């Protein structure tokens, strides 16, 4: 598995990975990811972590190699440098709240200059000998370059999982640099999709549009659940207020949709409280996003 963030059941990517791969033999699964933070799941024990702090060190220290392999079953959990993790989180919070193009390009440049293509990564790949590389499709270009490198080194089959739409470039507006960035992203995603042996989408509409755009077969992959027992849902009639709960990321414009829902609820509640929108996210939203989503008398 190749992911950008650590395999953590509390984030959306990690939760999806656990849903897909729980029940598999942990000895047959490894995860390469691009953060310093520790993983948190019961599925995978073999990891290779490349942090951006490591990349910076590798640029200024000639013999420093970015990235480290570890076995989470045998690793001393106290060896995780909490200070580095906190610094990293502050950095990513900044990028999430200020996702301007120049900052994104600065990160891409860091991955271009950092020495992550090294003997440590090669040894990890040689020791594990993957048959299949499963990777969610990310907006960042460096994750695709990392994928291509792993693919070339291992000759493993690639399965690419498309969730968010990174192919659309027209009609989205934005600055000149934003439009250039979207075109670069779309071209990179298309290249990865064409190199992949199998492409999955998350909806019939995305499957149809991606198949036409890329001229390649797309399949649909949903998260699983146990439907052997029909759940019983009961409405709490002791109170009139109906709560709508959203749990997940507010990035990629989702805060705008939540804002539209909050405004609709605010109108409905004008004469009497009927609905309440509760929003839970692992990420701190920008001030603009928070002002849009959180409305008095609605959310």
What are these regions (language model features)?
Residues 121-143, 157-159:
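Short N-terminal targeting/anchoring amphipathic segment
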Residues 1-78, 218, 226, 263-271:
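N-terminal subdomain of nucleotide-sugar transferases
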Residues 116-123, 145-153, 166, 179-198:
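Membrane-proximal helix-turn-helix segments that form the acceptor-binding/catalytic region
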Residues 35-36, 191-218:
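A short, active-site helix/loop in glycosyltransferases that binds the activated sugar's phosphate group
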Residues 132, 136, 148-169:
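Active-site proximal beta-strand in glycosyltransferases
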Residues 71-132:
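Conserved nucleotide-sugar donor-binding subdomain of glycosyltransferases
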Residues 226-297:
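Conserved catalytic-core segment of nucleotide-activated headgroup transferases in glycan assembly
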Residues 205, 223-224:
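Carbohydrate-associated surface elements
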């Amino acid at each position: 598995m190749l992911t950008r963030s650590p395999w953590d059941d509390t984030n959306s990517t990690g939760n999806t990975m656990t849903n897909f791969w729980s029940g598999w033999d942990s000895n047959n699964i490894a995860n390469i990811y691009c953060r310093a933070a520790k993983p948190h799941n019961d599925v995978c024990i073999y990891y290779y972590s490349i942090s951006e702090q490591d990349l910076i060190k590798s640029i200024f220290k000639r013999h420093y190699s970015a990235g480290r392999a570890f076995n989470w079953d045998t690793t001393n959990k106290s060896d995780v440098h909490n200070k580095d993790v906190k610094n990293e989180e502050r950095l990513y919070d900044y990028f999430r709240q200020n996702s301007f193009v120049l900052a994104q390009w600065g990160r891409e440049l860091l991955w271009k200059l950092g020495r992550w293509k090294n003997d440590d990564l090669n040894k990890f790949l040689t020791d594990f000998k993957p048959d299949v590389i499963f990777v969610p499709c990310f907006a960042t270009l460096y994750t695709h370059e990392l994928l291509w490198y792993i693919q070339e080194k291992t000759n493993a089959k690639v399965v690419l999982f498309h969730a968010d739409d990174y192919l659309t470039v027209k009609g989205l507006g934005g600055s000149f640099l934003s439009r250039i960035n979207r075109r670069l992203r779309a071209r990179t995603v298309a290249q990865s999709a064409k190199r992949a042996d199998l492409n999955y989408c998350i909806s019939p509409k995305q499957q149809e549009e991606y198949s036409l755009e890329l001229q390649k077969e797309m399949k649909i992959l949903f998260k699983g659940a146990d439907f052997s027992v029909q759940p019983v849902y009961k409405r709490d009639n002791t109170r009139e207020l109906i709560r709508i709960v959203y749990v997940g990321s507010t990035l990629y414009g989702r805060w705008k949709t939540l804002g539209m829902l909050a405004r609709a609820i605010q109108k409905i509640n004008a004469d009497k409280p009927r609905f309440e929108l509760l929003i839970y996210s692992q990420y701190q939203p920008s001030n603009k996003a928070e002002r849009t989503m959180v409305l008095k008398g609605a959310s």
